[in-house]
């Protein structure tokens, strides 16, 4: 198999609710290379978020296979999966999921501390990431003292602190105003170029998706390339 950063083949996903079975993903196959910036667009309920969860190993497909750096997520155990996610993947969500009692700096340090990394090294790297997202002056602030855009920048810094090869972002600007949304997208493009981090963004914002070099469209569980 050709070397891809991310590769999925024939992904199908069903959800069972009582006697009702719903197919959410229908034979999805696609690949991403290192450093790519890709958007998946589609209406609410089209299967975008489900696909992102499957690609990130947060949910299992009913059938099909996902490969990260040529390693199948379906052929490793839970500990190996957690290690692979920590090594290669970062996650950003519509809601920042920051811990309210911790400062911006402490929130960004958290993935490294969980990974048992040296505290002073974790602090140094977290400070650098907060500087990279334009928040060097806000590192001691708790989430409640930050704006919505600033909180999402902290979440992006946290997703990047372990130097992932790929960041999976689920509607990262979904609850932000237009000006803030555009600044977050500009930040993602800047980080992509400067650090060669690949981003896969799920969004329903077609205007922003058009700024990216590659777009995929999800409709009723079917993924197709937009040309």
Swiss-Prot record:
Chain residues that bind ATP: 42-49
SMART domains, A to Z: AAA (SM00382)
UniProt keyword annotation of Mitochondrion present: no
Any one GO MF annotation of this record: ATP hydrolysis activity
SUPFAM superfamilies noted in UniProt: P-loop containing nucleoside triphosphate hydrolases
UniProt keyword list: ATP-binding, Cell inner membrane, Cell membrane, Membrane, Nucleotide-binding, Translocase, Transport
Cellular localization per UniProt: Cell inner membrane
Segments traversing the membrane: none
Self-association and partners: The complex is composed of two ATP-binding proteins (LolD) and two transmembrane proteins (LolC and LolE).
Function: Part of the ABC transporter complex LolCDE involved in the translocation of mature outer membrane-directed lipoproteins, from the inner membrane to the periplasmic chaperone, LolA. Responsible for the formation of the LolA-lipoprotein complex in an ATP-dependent manner.
Family membership noted in the UniProt record: Belongs to the ABC transporter superfamily. Lipoprotein translocase (TC 3.A.1.125) family.
Protein name, as recorded: Lipoprotein-releasing system ATP-binding protein LolD
Organism: Pasteurella multocida (strain Pm70)
Native organism taxonomy: Bacteria, Pseudomonadati, Pseudomonadota, Gammaproteobacteria, Pasteurellales
